[in-house]
Amino acid sequence: MSNKSNRMPLIDALKAVAAMLVLLNHFSSYGPLAEAAREAFPAIFDWCFEYGRMAVQVFLVIAGFLAARGLSAQGEALAVSPLPLIWKRYLRLAVPYLAAIGLAIIAAALANQWLDDEAIPDRATFAQWLAHAFLLHNLLGFEALSAGVWYIAIDFQLFALMTLLLWAGRARLVAPALVLIVATTSLFWFNRDASWDNWAIYFFGSYGL
């Protein structure tokens, strides 16, 4: 079966719209262009600043749906070891992510030559780069090298948590029940405490939907 036949147009459309809203949110939030845009079109870009970030929830729900579809399409427990699946997910994320981080470092170094703006990160240290490479920068308290890299780390954490829950269930009904319990706990407890926002459990309510 070709990859084309596995596409879901509605999912693709939702991701495209959400991506545009997140892009507009970033455009209205960072750098001198954001200030100029908000001065020129205050109503539009104030709205993008306040509400564009909510589109991240669309990505979280879709990512959870696709993870569940791939790992447990019929609601069954995961029968194989979770570690190879988690490693495969890391590699899938890391290759384009590290390339983007490299470009971000170069772009920031060039921008620092001409602009003095707090949105431009300082020169990256080796420890900072290493933390980003292993998707630990949020947890270790390093400054992000780019505005959206927090999501890549959270996506990896969420996939790992979903995989471990489905594997730990070891039975058809127990596995989805574990996902439901953790998602409910996230919605009504962890998601209400911003101190957890660097951890997957903070977002798992949306992911588990």
PLM regions and their residue ranges:
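Membrane-interface helix-loop-helix regions
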Residues: P42-I44, L93-I154, T185-F188
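Specific transmembrane alpha-helix
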Residues: A55-S72, Y151-W167, I181-L209
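Short, Lys/Arg-rich, polar N-terminal cytosolic tail immediately upstream
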Residues: M1-I11
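Juxtamembrane transmembrane-helix termini
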Residues: A55-R89, P96-D117
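Membrane-interfacial entry segments at the cytosolic side of transmembrane helices
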Residues: R170-L178
